[in-house]
Design a protein with these regions (language model features):
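Hydrophobic alpha-helical targeting segments used for export or membrane insertion
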Residues: 8-15
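Bacterial N-terminal signal peptides that target proteins for export
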Residues: 1-8
Length: 160
């Protein structure tokens, strides 16, 4: 199944779960479920587990037509008490993921929701370990200079 289809289905399923709809059969068809009925974490029951918000940051990058749905899932997770700064297994918070994917609107959304741009990445990857959002953006701008991140920098600078 194409990743875009899985991500689209996941966004819809998580939205349903977070709004207390009975979508467990559909979510199961993608091999995912909430972990211990916690809307803040998703699992496949075989070792994959990820924080809902950072997973949706990745879905936002992939779903150009369904970004509104992804934002609704993110907002529902935040309203359910999920940690806006909870990192994934690489140490990326949702804000870091949005920076990596070069999504200024999503960066703005996370910052307005209370994401901490000064939170340091804790990662086994030495190149990113200890960087805050500003330093991470600087690293990306130097490593991939042909990708325009000027709008992203403008958003982040408003929160410096």
């Amino acid at each position: 199944m194409p990743a875009k289809t899985i991500a689209a289905g996941l966004a819809i399923m998580v939205c349903g779960l977070l709004t207390n709809n009975a979508w467990s059969d559909s979510l199961a068809s993608f091999g995912l479920r909430t972990k211990d009925k916690n809307p803040c974490r998703l699992t496949d029951g075989r070792g994959f587990e990820a924080p809902t918000i950072v997973l949706m940051a990745g879905a936002y990058d992939k779903l150009s037509k369904d970004k509104v749905v992804v934002l609704e899932v993110i907002d529902a997770a935040i309203n359910a008490g999920c940690d806006i700064d909870e990192p994934d297994e690489l140490g990326f918070s949702p804000l870091n993921a949005a920076i990596l994917y070069n999504e200024p609107a999503l960066v703005e959304h996370f910052l307005q929701a209370g994401a901490d741009p000064y939170r340091r990445i804790v990662s086994s990857r030495a190149s990113i370990d200890g960087l805050d959002a500003f330093e991470f953006l600087h690293l990306l701008m130097n490593k991939v200079p042909n990708q325009d991140r000027t709008p992203l920098r403008a958003v982040l600078e408003r929160y410096q």
